[in-house]
A protein has these predicted regions:
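Short glycine/proline-centered loop/turn elements that form peptide/ligand docking sites
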Residues: 82, 86, 107-108, 129-130
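Conserved catalytic-core motifs of GNAT/GCN5-like acyltransferases
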Residues: 100, 113, 118-134
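Short amphipathic alpha-helix that is part of the acyltransferase structural core
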Residues: 1-27, 123
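Active-site rim helix/loop that mediates acceptor-substrate recognition in acyltransferases
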Residues: 19-42
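Conserved acetyl-CoA-binding loop-helix of GNAT-fold acetyltransferases
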Residues: 72, 78-91
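Conserved GNAT acetyl-CoA-binding A-motif
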Residues: 91-104
Length: 134
């Protein structure tokens, strides 16, 4: 497996990975690709020419880095890839005051806790979803 921050992926490769885990973002390949290309950090994992994992981080250059998602193709899950991506991100952002995770599903919270994140006692993720407006 090769881990890299180089944004060498294609729109089609990203779409295929997102759809493999049933993420609705995969239905918007052009927007997804643009978002990734303008993200602070995109860590990808490759098995030869196949994109098998991706982590996206948005940061403010000093204080806060937010892990927006950690995605691993179903055929590669359970092999420690997601954990290695998170550890890489933790090392890269170790001098920031905060590294936050945004698990899309509560079932993923234990994964983040296992890697040193804490659940915010009085906090909750919130969002506005504009999917129906597009």
């Amino acid at each position: 497996m090769k881990y890299t921050e180089q944004k060498i992926f294609t729109q089609e490769q990203v779409q295929k990975l997102f759809l493999s885990v049933n993420w609705i973002s995969g239905n918007y390949p052009e927007r997804l690709y643009k978002a990734l290309m303008h993200s602070s950090t995109v860590l990808t994992v490759w098995d030869d020419e196949k994109l098998v994992g991706i982590t996206r981080v948005l940061d403010d250059t000093e204080m806060l880095a937010r892990v927006h998602y950690v995605i691993v193709h179903p055929d590669y899950q359970g092999k420690g890839i997601a954990g290695q991506m998170i550890e890489y991100i933790k090392e890269k952002y170790k001098n920031f005051l905060y590294i936050e995770g945004m698990p899309e599903d509560k079932k993923n919270v234990p994964f983040y806790v296992k890697h040193g994140f804490s659940v915010m006692e009085n906090g909750a993720a919130i969002q506005i979803c504009n999917l129906d407006k597009n």
